[in-house]
Every structure is written in structure tokens, then in C-alpha cells.
Amino acid sequence: MSCIAVEAVLLGILLYIPIVLSDDRAPIPANSAQLNSWFDGIIQPVAVRKATMDPALVTAEGQAKVIKLKSDGSGDFKSINEAIKSIPDDNTKRVILSFSPGNYSEKVKIGMYKHYITFYGEDPNNMPILVFGGTAAEYGTVDSATLIVESNYFSAVNLKIVNSAPRPDGKRVGAQAAALRISGDKASFYNVKIYGFQDTLCDDKGKHFYKDCYIEGTVDFIFGSGKSIFLNTELHAVPGDQPAIITAQARKTESEDTGYYFVNCRVTGGGAFLGRSWMPAAKVVFAYTEMGDAIHPEGWILVKPEHESTVRFPEYNNKGPGANMEKRAKFVKRLSDAEAKQSISLGSIEASKWLLPPRVVGLP
């Protein structure tokens, strides 16, 4: 056989090698029973998606290191912060902090140069708890968080994050207390439960993904300038004397590519508004979400009258008594089917480039 013929045969073989391309533009299904199979079909392991993923991420995932932590300090390091300190700046490989069950009473910060870190709870039925009681009075609002992540490609699996500071009573100055601040890009959270009152989750900036999570709070308990999808996640408004406000998204202008997307979620608890116009062009979308009768009929709050023409608070095919649109504020828009198909997808956070399924760590 000639060299030309051999080359032709090899080319033919290569053309028929299957390459898995993650189509993150496919709309998220309305039926919650289909979510997992749909997600697993799109967000496959890195080994079959190398062609579409960030090259540096592909390299990092091939060199994973596991650090074991125990709440009594008998793991590879005595504390979470010691373990993080051991990771070099400009880290280029995945480092998995694997937590045994128990309480970890620390205020933890991952700096902006410590990329590719995973917090992994070994037992999803007995999840490790990160807990601290920082407040705005002591640290400032965004720095009060129990866990602060400023680096890229962070992931958390099977974890509880708690700010144990007391509920604000309207009298104490600086009583806000965040549990989590995520300021890095391309972060994912699977089966993570986040507890606080006012300002529980600072979804600060970057593209983020939450699946099968639980977030509770009172006032503005999800706030910031992130561009994030919340999928199959429970939003629990802690009952109190005043209605809760779930979101305070911080988009200032129409040109900013940020916003929160709640898809196939559940809103539970006491009386609540879905959000308020903290900033002039705040953008929050609720779709296929179960809303109990705790939701105020108007749904949303305008902080300033002039925000009426600039905020974007669309809703699409939500369910339950709280989803009734008859008494919604007049600035609330119903998405059309075409608009929903275009915007309610993993493509809005470019998931095909970076989002991976939750890591499963095999331990001896």
C-alpha cells in the first residue's frame, strides 16, 4: 500500500472518531424529573469534552491532588486555612480538600490566585459544616462571610456553610452576616446548603452554577453582580415580622452581562418578595419554579420609581399559588417561548467551556 493510501485510511479513521461536544444551548427542561438525565447528557466528564473546554482546566483536572481534613484536626492539616496556605499561588492542578463529617469552626478565605480548589464532603448524608459568626460591624458586609472564594474554577460538593451570627433585629448596626461570598469566575456548587439571615449569599461576580442546593435567609439573601444559574435549588425565606426579600441583583446598566436565573427551583418559608431593584438594571429570571403562597402577590419591589423602565424581572411558567401573575407589579414581564428558549440554558454561563459534574473522590 502506498503512503498516500495509508494516509487516506488514517484520515478516514480520524474522521469517524466520535468527539463529544457539549451543547449548552439546549433549553433546560421544564419537567424536573428530566433534569438529571438532561444534565448528565450535556455536562459529561472532562475526558470526553476536551475539545470544547478551557485548555488550562483540562490540564488541571488530569493532575488532581487530595488533602484529607478532619474536624478534630487529625487530617493532613490541622485546619482548613493551613491546607489552603499549602496550595501555591497560580496553582495549575486540581486540589481537593476532602472533609470528613463534623463542625469546622473557621473563617476561610481562598485568595484570587489559588485556582482549581474543590471542597468535597465525603458523606452527603452527614455533611461537614463550615461555621463562623462574622458580622458587617466587624468585617464589613462582603468580608463577613464564613467562606470567601476569590479564585477561579472553585467547586463545592456536599457541604454546609453557616454564618452563626444572630438574626438582625433592626437595632444593631452592622448586623448583616454573609455565609458565602463567591467572587471568582467559573464556580460550581452541588448539594451545598447555605444558612444565614440578611445577605446570606454574596454572589459577587463571575459565572457560577448551583444545583441541588439550599439557601435560606431574610433580607437580600442572594445579592451581588454574578451571572449565575440556580437549578433545582430551594430558596427558604426565614419567617419573621417583616417579609423576606430573596434577591438584590446589582446590575447597574443594560450593557452589563450579569443576572440570576432560577430554574426548576422551589420557594418556601414565610412571606417573601422575589427581589428588589437594588441597582437600576437588576436582572433576575424565575422559570419553572414552585412558589408557595408565601410570595407577595406583587412579587417584586422597586427601590426607586425610575427603575421601572430599566429593571428586568421576567417570569416564565412558574407553578403554585405564589406564581399567579394577575396581581404582579406592572413592570414584571412574562417571557415568551422564544425568549425563554434563548435565555434559559447553560449557554448563558458558557457551561460547555468549564462546568464539570460533581467530583466523586474515592478514599481508602
Swiss-Prot record:
Q: What is its main location?
A: secreted
Q: Which GO terms describe its biological process?
A: cell wall modification; pectin catabolic process
Q: Which reaction does it catalyse?
A: [(1->4)-alpha-D-galacturonosyl methyl ester](n) + n H2O = [(1->4)-alpha-D-galacturonosyl](n) + n methanol + n H(+)
Q: In which tissues is it expressed?
A: Expressed in pollen.
Record-level Gene Ontology MF annotations: pectinesterase activity
Q: What is its EC number?
A: 3.1.1.11
**PROSITE patterns assigned:** PECTINESTERASE_2
Residues at the active site: D220
| CC per GO annotation | extracellular region
Superkingdom: Eukaryota
Q: How is this chain modified after translation?
A: Glycosylated.
Query: Which residues have a glycan attached per UniProt?
Result: N103
Q: Which SUPFAM superfamilies match?
A: Pectin lyase-like
Q: Does the keyword Ion transport apply?
A: no
Signal sequence coordinates: 1-22
Where is this chain's protein located in or outside the cell?
A: Secreted
Q: In which pathway does it act?
A: Glycan metabolism; pectin degradation; 2-dehydro-3-deoxy-D-gluconate from pectin: step 1/5
Q: Which InterPro entries match?
A: Pectin_lyas_fold (IPR012334), Pectin_lyase_fold/virulence (IPR011050), Pectinesterase_Asp_AS (IPR033131), Pectinesterase_cat (IPR000070)
Q: Which UniProt keywords apply?
A: Allergen, Aspartyl esterase, Glycoprotein, Hydrolase, Secreted, Signal
Which one Pfam family would you cite for this protein? Pectinesterase
Its function, per the record, reads: Catalyzes the demethylesterification of homogalacturonan components of pectin. May be involved in pollen tube development.
PANTHER family listed in its UniProt record: ACYL-COA THIOESTER HYDROLASE YBHC-RELATED, PECTINESTERASE 63-RELATED
Q: What family does the Swiss-Prot or TrEMBL record give for this protein?
A: Belongs to the pectinesterase family.
Listed name of the protein: Pectinesterase 2
Organism expressing this protein natively: Olea europaea
Q: What is the lineage of its organism?
A: Eukaryota, Viridiplantae, Streptophyta, Embryophyta, Tracheophyta
